[in-house]
Amino acid sequence: MESVERVNLLGLDGAALSELVGQWGGKPFRARQLQRWVHQRGADSFDAMTDLARDFRAQLARDCVIEALPVNTEQRSSDGTRKWLFDVGQGNAIETVFIPEDDRGTLCISSQAGCVVNCRFCSTGHQGFNRNLRASEIIGQLWWAKRVLEAAADTARLPGGKAGEDTRVISNVVMMGMGEPLLNYDQVLPALRLMLDDNAYGLSRRRVTVSTSGVVPMMDRLSQDCPLALAVSLHAPNDALRDELVPLNRKYPLNALLAACERYLAHAPRDFITFEYCMLDGINDTDQHARELIQLARQVRCKLNLIPFNPFPASGLKRSPSARVRVFAQRLMDAGIVTTVRKTRGDDIDAACGQLAGEVRDRTRITERNATRTIPIQQVHA
């Protein structure tokens, strides 16, 4: 007799879970109860769900599972940053990073194993593309991290840990890990909906950010299906340079990208788009580039996030000197462009923005790769 694959409940958003429970004759409130057990309480056993009927739990045990990806390693930085390496099979892995700050806790999650966009400055792209992640594997990163962090948390040190305030460990999620989220849209969408669902993680639309290299048609779909904070990997102020740094620009050039950003803003929870700009020595960091970037930024409501490049041997690129980054940022601010600079985090555990390569076979090259995790922490100019 052929066995039937059991349904992984981690990958079902509220509508899909209600449909499943309805097929068994269950009421919608049962689906909500089940969703809270899985995502809010972090249950991985149906026996623990004591307020559900015994026959319902038996049905769940027969037909369903609650399974995240296997964890190969966990690393902790001296600055509090934590990283998990999840096994996706065939010797490949994805990486998930938690960045604690005084006023928030941000989880950076992956949407693909590898990436097809192949941005020149990103080591993930240099690793090639393995496969899309399933919705259960995407939300499973949040599910796992929430369980681990909450189990170990000292309440007095949680973000927002004052009396009467939200004391959740993970207050923000950014889809800025491995992969291009909008090229895995059908699996990313239910994961995003779960992040926002009050019966699951209950995050604000302003606190969930999708970062895209500029997949214009899917930006339009996201604005209709699940509008939330959007970051665009810009990295160049003109098409000629962006064609070289972000090859997707050859399909969706800057004029199309900026128009899509303007359309997105009509539905977005924030009144601006974040443009990410990796600072590359002698490549995109000159005064002329700053002038071009100012003209581009004035075409859409945005803020600029300047990212120090984290070198890796295959790129052939170098990080812009700190003094050059400061001058570049000041020029933008003097022109009235809101600008932030990211601070490096987790450099001792190889947890870098644009550097998540998910290596399983060789985890010993941390010094060689010299990667750093970066997060936005300061405004350059008030």
UniProtKB/Swiss-Prot annotation:
Cofactor note: Binds 1 [4Fe-4S] cluster. The cluster is coordinated with 3 cysteines and an exchangeable S-adenosyl-L-methionine.
Chain ranges of the Radical SAM core domain: 101-348
Required cofactor(s): [4Fe-4S] cluster
A cellular-component GO term for this protein: cytoplasm
Localization, UniProt: Cytoplasm
Keyword Translocase applies: no
Enzyme class (EC, first level): transferase
InterPro entries hit by this protein: Aldolase_TIM (IPR013785), Methyltransferase_A (IPR040072), RlmN_N (IPR048641), RNA_MTrfase_RlmN (IPR027492), rRNA_lsu_MTrfase_RlmN/Cfr (IPR004383), rSAM (IPR007197)
EC number per UniProt: 2.1.1.192
Coiled-coil region list: none
Binding site for [4Fe-4S] cluster: C115, C119, C122
Active site: residue positions: E95, C353
Presence of the UniProt keyword Cell division in the record: no
Major localization class: cytoplasm
Pfam families: Radical_SAM (PF04055), RlmN_N (PF21016)
Gene Ontology BP annotations: rRNA base methylation; tRNA methylation
Domain of life: Bacteria
Chain positions recorded as S-adenosyl-L-methionine binding sites: G179, E180, S211, S233, L234, H235, N310
Disulfide cysteine pairs (residue numbers): C108-C353
One of the record's GO molecular function terms: tRNA binding
Chain's role: Specifically methylates position 2 of adenine 2503 in 23S rRNA and position 2 of adenine 37 in tRNAs. m2A2503 modification seems to play a crucial role in the proofreading step occurring at the peptidyl transferase center and thus would serve to optimize ribosomal fidelity.
NCBIfam families xrefs: rRNA_mod_RlmN
Extra remark beyond the main annotation: Reaction proceeds by a ping-pong mechanism involving intermediate methylation of a conserved cysteine residue.
UniProt record similarity statement: Belongs to the radical SAM superfamily. RlmN family.
Protein name: Dual-specificity RNA methyltransferase RlmN
Source organism of the structure: Bordetella parapertussis (strain 12822 / ATCC BAA-587 / NCTC 13253)
Lineage, broadest ranks: Bacteria, Pseudomonadati, Pseudomonadota, Betaproteobacteria, Burkholderiales
